[in-house]
Curated annotation (Swiss-Prot):
Coiled-coil segments: none
Protein name: Mucoricin
Gene from which this protein is expressed: RLT1
InterPro entries tied to this protein: Ricin_B-like_lectins, Ricin_B_lectin
GO MF: rRNA N-glycosylase activity; toxin activity
Keyword Hydrolase: yes
Lineage: Eukaryota, Fungi, Fungi incertae sedis, Mucoromycota, Mucoromycotina
Top-level EC class: hydrolase
Organism: Rhizopus delemar (strain RA 99-880 / ATCC MYA-4621 / FGSC 9543 / NRRL 43880) (Mucormycosis agent)
Length: 147
């Protein structure tokens, strides 16, 4: 999936159209990443840019991270201060043509809407990649910000 590095975008679920958001618009380390209805104003906490493997939040300048660095299923996705590349295995991500966003160090683990819940404020977790219709809550699209 092609996108321009450094450009702001929403990370939108192919499952329910909600976007990745930082809970309560926090700018603090360890804030949970959730899905929420896309906003069109006051939306910096829903906007991201991609640089050198990091997804960086536009409001906080923190990056997508795995709580405690635990690369295992059901680990909570959070935002955290960016680490140096050699220490950032749990902060470096890629996205494939099917829309799976996966940890570069563990391509079998992807961003997942916990429990495939279809509502706001549901946590985003790391989970084993699934295929077919059951994988919709694990697939995303990067939607450029036009503001």
């Amino acid at each position: 999936m092609y996108f321009e590095e450094g450009r702001l975008f929403f990370i939108k679920s192919q499952f329910n159209g909600r976007v990745l958001d930082v809970e309560d618009g926090s700018t603090e380390d360890d804030a949970n990443i959730i899905v929420y209805t896309q906003k069109y104003e006051d939306c910096l906490n829903q906007l991201w840019r991609y640089e050198n493997g990091y997804f960086i939040n536009a409001k906080s300048a923190k990056v997508l991270d795995i709580r405690g660095g635990e690369m295992q299923p059901e680990s909570q996705i959070i935002q955290y201060a960016q680490k140096m590349v050699e220490e950032a295995a749990n902060q470096r991500w890629a996205i494939d043509e099917d829309g799976y966003i996966f940890c570069e160090a563990r391509p079998d683990l992807v961003l997942d809407i916990q429990g495939a819940e279809d509502e706001d404020c549901v946590p985003v977790i790391l989970y084993e990649r699934r295929e077919g219709e059951v994988s919709a809550n694990q697939r995303w699209e990067l939607v450029p910000f036009e503001g």
